[in-house]
Amino acid sequence: MGSNDLINEAYDDSEVVGEERESKSAWMKRWYQLLTSPLDLQLVINEKLEMINWDAYAKSLAKPLGNFLTILFFIIRLLQDNLIKPNYYKLNVKSGAFDLSKSNKLKEFDYLWEISSSFQNSNQFYAFQSWYFVTLRFLNNLFRFTIFILLSLNLYVSCKFMFGYFKTYNLFHLKKEFNSPNLTKHNLKDLSKEYYEDIYKQSLWSMLKHFFRGSRDDGPHVNQNEVEIFFQLRKWIPTNFIINLFVSFSPTAIVFLSFSDVSFTSAIAIVFHQYILDYIITKRFQRSVDDDLILSSAALQEYEDKHIMARINQCSNIDTLSSAMGTRSKTPRIFTTHSLCGEEIREVYNYEKREFEALPKMTESVPGSRETRIKDYGGISQVSDNQSHPIGFHYSPRMSPYYRDKVLDNNLAQSSSNENLEKGGAFLPNQDQNRPSKSLSPLRKTPLSARQKRFEGSEFNVLNKNDINSILRSPKKKKNYHKR
């Protein structure tokens, strides 16, 4: 057992030694990579920074940070003008220039030596070396260094805000040239030159390799005529984080504090300036941009609903429409909106006038849905002038006069046939050329026995009963009857 314990201990020690060697080799590799390729570390840091959603920290980090830097600059300028500036002569004058004890000429005369010794014993000679002025000298140097850092940071934020956030858009379908300095016209052959912009964004070592090896023609080419052009829009789109940081740490406040005598009353002007700038840019201009985005989204949605979806629904109606009727009735698409008073407005698009027309508020003029029309297609509806037509079949506005005349002719034919039947006469389909339609025939609405009795009492009673039955029960008549 003792030998096994020793073996296990030796095995465990070897594992620990191996882990230490691996950790040391890993650290050596990291230091070697850092020394040989420091730009790779810069790329890694930039990737980590770009992956952070800075807009989420616009209100919680950017605005408090900018206000803190502005207040810090104000306090430093206040101390400089009220604490350092009155003692500027005492802090910057050399004390050795008035040290009479170092003069060999004065030492030759006794009375002058006594005068110089009296100056040395006074407090004015040693005032430059007191702890108070030593502290002021240190604060003066610290204030200068801090102001230099704050000015550099403000200059960087301002340049980043004004010149660092641009995106380029290639507009190939734009035909009209607008009056904008950010919109430029280019040839299609210029697209191959954009390949160099990607090289400039790479590391320094990649750029050197590219330019020392020679330019390779790896960029995209467009085989187009020289006359063909496209527009390029360079749009300025700063992020919310940099906007809030620029507003709270504005260069106008920094310039005002740098070139003016700062006092406690200057704080009122700084607070008023910060509030006005934040109100104009973030609460008015930035929200106006968001409102324009809402309006453009609403206009695009309205165009999609009224134009694109209407065309899609029209094509689907053409595909699903049955061809049994022979012609297709055009049902315009109804769009429902609301007025400012909350009243419902129904509009239909007139393709001839190219505008929307408001429909009357009567419910009879509004066509029903397709499901309602299919459900009630087999029924018969009665209108006010005792006309009958199938429910769900709506005529086109252009064809409505034609069908109205047809229905009127059918009603006249029906009324004339009813009058003749009341007089004792009967009409056979082959004997009358101006007979009514099959669906409106009076013989279709009466049973066979009643028609037979009515026929027997007419002027055609000279025919025998078999001939009458054969005429009434003819195959053609039966076939037409089932076609209904």
Swiss-Prot record:
InterPro entries: Nur1/Mug154. Residues 430-440 have a biased composition (Polar residues). GO terms for biological process: maintenance of rDNA; regulation of exit from mitosis. The modification Phosphoserine is found at residues 3, 417, 474. It is a multi-pass membrane protein. It comes from the Eukaryota. Residues 416-457 are annotated as: Disordered. Its main location: nucleus. It is found in: Nucleus membrane. The keyword Glycosyltransferase does not apply. Keywords: Membrane, Nucleus, Phosphoprotein, Transmembrane, Transmembrane helix. The chain crosses the membrane at residues 145-165, 237-257. One of its GO terms (cellular component) is nuclear membrane. It holds the Pfam family DUF2418. The keyword Transmembrane helix applies. Interacts with CSM1. Member of a perinuclear network that controls recombination at multiple loci to maintain genome stability. Required for rDNA repeat stability. PANTHER family: NUCLEAR RIM PROTEIN 1 (PTHR28293:SF1). Belongs to the NUR1 family. This is Nuclear rim protein 1. The lineage of its organism: Eukaryota, Fungi, Dikarya, Ascomycota, Saccharomycotina.
